[in-house]
Curated annotation (Swiss-Prot):
HAMAP family: Enolase (MF_00318). The lineage of its organism: Bacteria, Pseudomonadati, Pseudomonadota, Gammaproteobacteria, Lysobacterales. One of its GO terms (molecular function) is magnesium ion binding. This is Enolase. Mg(2+) binds at residues 244, 287, 314. It comes from Xanthomonas campestris pv. campestris (strain ATCC 33913 / DSM 3586 / NCPPB 528 / LMG 568 / P 25). It is found in: Cytoplasm; Secreted; Cell surface.
């Protein structure tokens, strides 16, 4: 039986040493599921509320005991004997129980932990891996996603002078996920050698990418191209580039303040700046190219390069189906980043991905800068045919755990395993 017998939460630590919530759901048949909730550094203002205690004498105010108490009290009592196999019904009960638009009463971290743990428990009850169980919910084919590997960190993810938050490599020319992972790993180690050769730091940021000081943002791109070549791959063929500009972080009074470039640019000027990069480098994806409130600028960027580059809304859409619909209706961006903790339940996450598929927008399942060993997002990416996954660099076990889970899934699928490769960019095939 898949009725809920017990729900339990606790406070654990994430990869940045901050508290986060872990939830467990036990079913009447003894089946068990566990999930840990991630946390972001650069966050959209419209994200669901991550409930923190605010007690400065404990974990500098970042404790999550209130959220834990909400799970162990109100949520556990309400969901006792509920059928966890009814994922939509369970998530609707959680949303109604919170009763706020942004999940601020009980906390999105409380709701999400239970929502994901319940799915794990039902998968265990059915003796299925999570990806297989989720694919029955989504009624979707399965595919191994292209990894967007963040090998240089800047912005809010690193203590350096690089304005842009992530510089990524995408191994699109590989025939399998395992080969793509190998390519990314070889480029990562090649990049370390190149940085050392240039006398630059090889310290890593929150997501495992290197975080050196460069003379300019464009030097990061040039250094990556050098590393790709040194590793024996061809940029523009085997490997494409991606950026997470995270421009809301340096958008101030209507201007984009690029400290590393010593420039303050209007929306029009910044669109020109990005378009010039697209013309010069094999860039296939730009995330948060404009600030989350600069919808006019987003439209300019979409009109300018949206037919040849994937334009990903993260802070812009915050995995929220209501906000995402506004973007679809206005033709803004052409892809959405999917972060489970931005919206707070599995059902709403799957709804956002389904909306993307229906509108011919690409969907990219993503980690957060504060992660754990939890690998749920790997299963979600496969089960929804999301075609791309962002889960950091090729070091730090909190990032590599997701890659290793994808290797396991690929092996389990055997001859039925399909790697998205160049077909990942669905929004560019219109």
């Amino acid at each position: 039986m898949t009725t809920i017998a017990k729900i339990l939460a606790r406070e654990i630590l994430d990869s940045r040493g901050n508290p986060t919530l872990e939830a467990e759901v036990t079913l009447a048949d003894g089946s068990f599921g566990r999930a840990a909730v991630p946390s972001g550094a650069s966050t959209g203002t419209k994200e669901a509320v991550e409930l923190r205690d605010g007690d400065k004498t404990r974990y500098l105010g970042k404790g999550v005991r209130k959220a834990v108490e909400n799970v162990n009290g109100t949520i556990a009592e309400t969901l006792k004997d509920f059928d966890a196999a009814d994922q939509q019904g369970l998530d609707r009960r959680l949303i109604d129980l919170d009763g706020t638009e942004n999940k601020g009463r009980l906390g999105a971290n409380a709701l999400l932990g239970v929502s994901l743990a319940a799915a794990h428990a039902v998968a265990a009850s059915r003796k299925q891996p999570l990806w297989q169980y989720l694919s029955t919910i989504t009624e979707s084919d399965v595919a191994l996603p292209v990894p967007m590997m963040n090998i240089i960190n800047g912005g809010a993810h690193a203590d350096n002078n690089v304005d842009f938050q992530e510089f990524m490599v995408l191994p699109v020319g590989c025939s399998s996920f395992s080969e793509a992972l190998r390519a990314g790993t070889e480029i990562f180690h090649s990049l370390k050698s190149v940085l050392k050769g240039h006398g630059l730091s090889t310290a890593v940021g929150d997501e495992g990418g290197f975080a050196p000081d460069f003379r300019s943002n464009v030097e990061a791109l040039d250094t990556i191209l050098e590393a790709i070549g040194k590793a024996g791959y061809t940029a523009g063929e085997d490997i494409l580039l991606g950026l997470d500009v995270a421009s809301s972080e340096f958008y101030d009074n209507g201007k984009y303040n690029l400290v590393g470039e010593n420039k303050r640019l209007t929306s029009e000027q910044f669109v020109d700046f990005l378009a010039d990069w697209v013309a010069q480098y094999p860039i296939i994806s730009i995330e948060d190219g404009l600030a989350e409130d600069d919808w006019a600028g987003w439209k300019l960027l979409t009109d300018r390069v949206g037919k040849k580059v994937q334009l990903v809304g993260d802070d812009l859409f915050v995995t929220n189906p209501k906000i995402f619909k506004e973007g679809i209706d206005s033709g803004t961006a052409n892809a959405i980043l999917i972060k489970v903790n931005q919206i707070g339940t599995l059902t709403e996450t799957l709804e956002a991905i389904a909306m993307a598929h229906a509108a011919n927008y690409a969907s990219i399942v993503s980690h957060r800068s504060g992660e754990t060993e939890d690998t749920t997002i790997a299963d979600i990416a496969v089960a929804t045919t999301a075609t791309q996954i962002k889960t950091g660099s090729l070091c730090r076990s909190d990032r590599v755990a997701k890659y290793n889970q994808l290797l396991r899934i690929e092996q389990a699928l055997g001859s039925g395993a399909r790697y998205a490769g160049r077909d990942a960019f669905v929004s560019l095939k219109r």
